[in-house]
């Protein structure tokens, strides 16, 4: 069980294949979802959303000390290794100002989701403090239930409802607050029809019928928005200018490389001082996030060393 997963960040805890025997001890309900691959190796039935949820429960308990985790049916069940990669690469970005990863960084997660995945990983790995924003009251309730069910998380993670339709930072970042970074996994598709087509494609690839519920399901606000991710991130870029002195790094995942040029143009238009692209790879899946700041090197050094 020592095969490497190519491309993961060096500090990612998921380089080796899953130790399913250990994970089944951590969460016994995972055992019923184990299958054999054509090569005769044990694996998890990734087409079954209950299996993926059981795997996530085991991973979060075993690696991140999250003993109690659950999400309502129909919400995204995120792949933990890929989410951890974003956190580790973000840590490297925050370290460039002072040479060390800040231990008390304050992070804003835009669209924290029912799963609360980024704060859970970031709190455990780096001791960061998180604010999570969310438009869905059901997702917010789920995330709060996870926080309340695990000792210590209430002190590290706070949640805020985004009540203003179409707003991202406005109404969430308060007047005197400062954040070392923001992160976001934006809605990917540009319509409900496109989101359904994407799910259909994945169903076919897994050889399932259309009635099967899947771990790549998700609520409307998780999967699509008008104009897709380019429009969403452009809106984020536009709003970020108003918080240029309160946030050191704004970041967002970008699912498709071809979406980068219009985003770079938007960043030039708002006067971003520095723009960084971080490439990531999880197995065959390529992804990346972009980061931008309105602070120069000296301003970022002072920001990191500010009184907290």
Curated annotation (Swiss-Prot):
One of its GO terms (molecular function) is 23S rRNA (adenine(1618)-N(6))-methyltransferase activity. GO terms for biological process: rRNA base methylation. It is an enzyme of class 2 (transferase). Its EC number is 2.1.1.181. It catalyses: adenosine(1618) in 23S rRNA + S-adenosyl-L-methionine = N(6)-methyladenosine(1618) in 23S rRNA + S-adenosyl-L-homocysteine + H(+). InterPro entries: METTL16/RlmF, rRNA_lsu_MeTfrase_F, SAM-dependent_MTases_sf. Specifically methylates the adenine in position 1618 of 23S rRNA. Belongs to the methyltransferase superfamily. METTL16/RlmF family. This is Ribosomal RNA large subunit methyltransferase F. It comes from Escherichia fergusonii (strain ATCC 35469 / DSM 13698 / CCUG 18766 / IAM 14443 / JCM 21226 / LMG 7866 / NBRC 102419 / NCTC 12128 / CDC 0568-73).
